Amino acid sequence: ASLSGSVSFFAVPAEEYIDADKRARLRKEGIGFPASGKSELIRLGEFDHSDIIMTTHVHMMPVEEDFYLGNAACNGFSAERVTVRGKAAHAAIDPWDGVNALSITSSAIQMMGLMRETFREEDHVRLHNVIRKAGDVINAVPDEAVIETKVRAASLDAIRATQEKMDRAYDGAAYAFGGTIEREPLQGYMPILHRGADKVMEESVKLLDASYRCSKPADFNNACTDVGDLTHLFPVLNFTFGGFAGKLHGADFKIMDEELAYIKPAKLLALTTYRLLCDQAKEAKKICREFKPV
């Protein structure tokens, strides 16, 4: 049967959020890559002629079935590069004349820890700080510290509110010690919007010798992915699959079932595409009509 439509394949770089220093080096080399693969493709306009996006990944949540159909809601995040300015002094002769940037940083991070009781469970807040620099020599009061921060939460409102708390922690610690704070906002990801299993995908998976379950509104993934950016612009038909063992991003990760990890996901993509585009793309057009960009 003829199909009404076309399919584009993207070899997209992994969604992993690379550090600010590496992004700065890439920019100097003329490589855009502001945060991750799909975000960059959006920036370049590569999806401008697309109507529906299909994505797939190994299971990101505990799932016993072979396939998980639909998009569970996921956190989004904001990020900053924070530079703490202090004042250098000899660490033994006159430390009282210095302003310790590392102490400011440590105090701010401790304050964030004490703030955790203010985070609502339904907001799924996660805070991350990585100290990239905290002084240069051991016998001098550190006059500069550089930290990359990340705030994860389930909604933009929760992200903004938590980011304000994090900023106040740094500002308050700097004020207490007599230092200053500089901030560079970094690109983050939008939260993933929940989408249930589309009929075309559920009908397709039934043709495979595989177990499955469909996403529910209560399902939530605390991680973040650049698919979140796509879900605000396009209907994203997603599924995840098993066939592996070990931890995601762990040294023990390995494929255990090549049929389930490679062959069946490819078949599910092909079968779903067929059902979207057959019969004058009836199902694809219905999905597009019902989708409202956010």
Regions found by a protein language model. Name each.
Residues 106-294:
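Metal-dependent amide/peptide-bond hydrolase catalytic core
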Residues 3-128, 135-140:
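Histidine/acidic-residue-rich, glycine-tolerant segments that coordinate divalent metal ions
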